[in-house]
Amino acid sequence: MALKITQVKGLVGTKPKQRDSMRSLGLKRIGQTVVREDNPIVRGQINTVRHMVEVEEVAGE
């Protein structure tokens, strides 16, 4: 199982921990989409920035 993560809000005015989570997920700009493996580490990063991203589950890797 994999997760398709899309950034929907910008990073201006966010806390450093949130910016670090977005960077480690590989998101830099609004509208950018990445696919990441579904694991507890990625889920925790998504939880930190859940108000700035949209997440979909996709089959495969």
UniProtKB/Swiss-Prot annotation:
Gene Ontology annotations of biological process type: translation
InterPro entries: Ribo_uL30_ferredoxin-like_sf (IPR036919), Ribosomal_uL30_bac-type (IPR005996), Ribosomal_uL30_ferredoxin-like (IPR016082)
Gene Ontology CC terms: cytosolic large ribosomal subunit
Pfam families to which the protein is assigned, alphabetical: Ribosomal_L30
SUPFAM superfamilies, per the entry: Ribosomal protein L30p/L7e
Annotated keywords: Ribonucleoprotein, Ribosomal protein
GO molecular function: structural constituent of ribosome
Subunit structure, interactors included: Part of the 50S ribosomal subunit.
Protein family membership: Belongs to the universal ribosomal protein uL30 family.
Name used for this protein in its record: Large ribosomal subunit protein uL30
